[in-house]
Structure formats: structure tokens, C-alpha cells
Amino acid sequence: MILPCAAVLFDVDGTLVDSTPLVERAAREWAAEYGIDPDEFLADAHGRRTSDRVADFLPPDRVREATARLDALEATGTDGITALPGAVELLAGMNGLPHAFVTSMDRAQLELRTGAAGIPLPPIVITAEDVPDGKPDPSGYLQAAGHLGVDPSGCLVIEDAPAGIAAGRAAGATVLAVLTSHPRESLAAAHHTVENLARVAAAPDGLHLRL
């Protein structure tokens, strides 16, 4: 199956990089410090900015300090961070197809995790610091499309989480979901779904999928 597109906009954590062990370990330590149920905190965490996640559980006057604490815990190491299947190969074979990263991580987290996973950063990267609102708001994907000079409707967004899928659709893009972190039924809003990026190959006019 061929998905024609003028540009590809990649989510990072859960799509290209697996940092689950680090994120869960940090979240559980943080939740214990702040008296929050760690399972509740993690339940809707994936694909969202840290500050937005924290704001769901703490009053506004504590969000900045608590966000900084969680960021610090997540920056304590890179153990267990790996590239997800097919990610390195797909990026190496983009063959001039314009692409960008749009992530809910801040720049420091992005560089730490992609570096540990061996994922090279493209020239255009949109992080949590670059947008007024995080996913599911479409701001990040709209910014990335603008920087690439491509109409959002001509972009293919690749995501692994419901919040990111909602952001891609709200931007007007076609959304491809990978089944790396969520069950298929929770990603039903995506236009297309594949197991992982090992089933995707780049071509000058878009991406080829092996379903």
C-alpha cells in the first residue's frame, strides 16, 4: 500500500524511540514524592507534555516546580532506551522526502533519548517548548508543516498515542499509527495502522506500507 505525501511528521517517544523503562521508573519515584497514585498518573501520560500531565494532578502554583522535578528524574540516565523496530532504517532511507520531528518532550529530553537510541535529528524539530499547547492540540504539527513549507493536508503524521493521533487529525494531516505502545482499539482514530516501522519504507512520493 502506498501513502502519498509531501512530508512526514514523526512523533518520537513510542514511535521512533522506546524509553518506557526510564519514564515509568521516574514517574513512580515522582508520584511517591508528591503523594499521587503512580498508576493513575501513568494511565494517560503517553504522548503528552510533562507540564500538562502534572497539571492534571497538582494545583497551578505547584506545576512548574513539580514539572522540573519530574524532568530531572527522567534525565538521570539512559538505561533501557532503544530505537524501535524499523526506525533507524526508515530514517536512513527517507531519500530526500521532507520530514520533521514533533515531540511532547523538551529539547534536552529529546537529545538525550534520541542520542541513546542512535536516532539522528532532522533539521526541523518541534519540542514542548516551541508550542503554546501540547498534544492533542495541533500546534506542533502545524508548526512543523509550516517550517517545511508544506500544507498540513499533504503531510503524513506517524504516531503511537491517542493524544498525538488527535493532534495530527486536528492539523488536517493523514495519520499512520504504530502499535508500539497502545492496543489497536485505542488508536482507531488513525487513518491507517501498522505493527511498527519495520513495515514502512520511504519513496520519493510517500511511504510504502506492508500491512
Summary of predicted features, one role per range:
Residues 1-6, 106-211:
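Asp-based, Mg2+/Mn2+-dependent phosphohydrolase catalytic module
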Residues 2-95, 106-107, 119-120:
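N-terminal helical cap/lid subdomain that shapes the substrate entry/recognition surface
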Residues 18, 101-103, 177:
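Hydrophobic residues in well-ordered beta-strands that form the structural core
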Residues 37, 98-100, 174:
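Residue-level detector of anion-binding/catalytic polar loops
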Residues 83, 102, 133:
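Residue-level marker of regulatory loop/turn positions in helix-turn-helix DNA-binding domains and
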Residues 92-98, 151-152:
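Short, surface-exposed connector motifs at secondary-structure boundaries
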